[in-house]
């Protein structure tokens, strides 16, 4: 997953959502997502938990959408996960800290 501090939601691909049994195709909650081709309404589902960077968050709302294969990214870690932590990005020294 790529870190995206400009994304309101964490994003997972359809294949992952379906493998987790989340049934995005019947989700009644939708979010607007800006893509290269315009604004799309995408399903919002709740993931039981996400663990990354040694941090765990339960009941995370995520959007379900596939990124282009050439992006080589399988999802985005957005604010629905990151808002639970203090995030420090130090570009000059090349490090990221989540606490």
Where are these regions (language model features)?
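Pepsin/retropepsin-fold aspartyl endopeptidases
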Residues: 1-99
């Amino acid at each position: 997953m790529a870190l995206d501090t400009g994304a309101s939601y964490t994003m997972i691909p359809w294949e992952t959502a379906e493998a987790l049994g989340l049934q995005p195709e019947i989700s009644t909650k939708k979010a607007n997502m800006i893509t290269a081709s315009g604004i799309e309404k995408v399903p919002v589902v709740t993931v039981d938990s996400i663990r990354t960077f040694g941090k765990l968050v339960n009941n995370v709302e995520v959007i379900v959408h596939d990124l282009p294969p050439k992006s080589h990214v399988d999802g985005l870690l957005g604010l629905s996960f990151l808002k639970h932590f203090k995030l420090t990005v130090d570009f000059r020294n090349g490090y990221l800290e989540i606490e």
